[in-house]
Amino acid sequence: ASAAGLLTSLPSATYAVSKHAAIALAEYLSIRHGDDGIRVSVLCPQAVDTPMIAGRTGSAAAANDGVISAQALADCVVEGMDAETFLILPHPQVLTYVERKAKDYDRWLDGMRRFASRLSGKVGR
C-alpha cells in the first residue's frame, strides 16, 4: 500500500483510492484469518528512492519527511514482519498524521484543502 492509503495522496484520486483499498483488504484478511494463524502486514511508506519518484520535484512528502532508500525500506519490512506488526510505517511521522486525522477529521480535511490549494498554486482560502 502506501501512506497515501492512510492519508489520501494528492493529486491522483485513482492512486489514493487504490491505496485505501489495499489497506482495507489487508485489514479484512487480518480480521478474517488472524485466528487461523495467518499474519498480515501492510507497508505504508511515503517517498522511497526508486525510479517511480526519479525526476519529480516538489513532492510534499519527500520535502517534509524525506526520501528513504530501498534498502532502508527493506530493512523496515523485515523488522515489521519479524515482529508481526500489522501497520509497517517506514516514515514514523505518518503515525502522527493518522492520529491527528482521526482526532479531528474536519480539521484534517480543512488542512488538506489548504494543502491542495498550495500544490495547485491557488492563493487564498
Could you tell me what each predicted segment is?
Residues 2:
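Residue(s) in the substrate-gating loop at a strand-loop-helix junction
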Residues 7, 28-38:
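Active-site-adjacent segment of SDR/Rossmann-fold oxidoreductases
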Residues 7-14:
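Active-site loop immediately N-terminal to the catalytic Tyr-X3-Lys motif
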Residues 15, 23:
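Catalytic tyrosine of NAD(P)H-dependent dehydrogenase/reductases that use a Tyr as the general acid/base
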Residues 18:
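Active-site helix of classical SDR
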Residues 45-55:
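Short, flexible catalytic-loop segment of classical short-chain dehydrogenase/reductase
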Residues 64-125:
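C-terminal tail/cap regions
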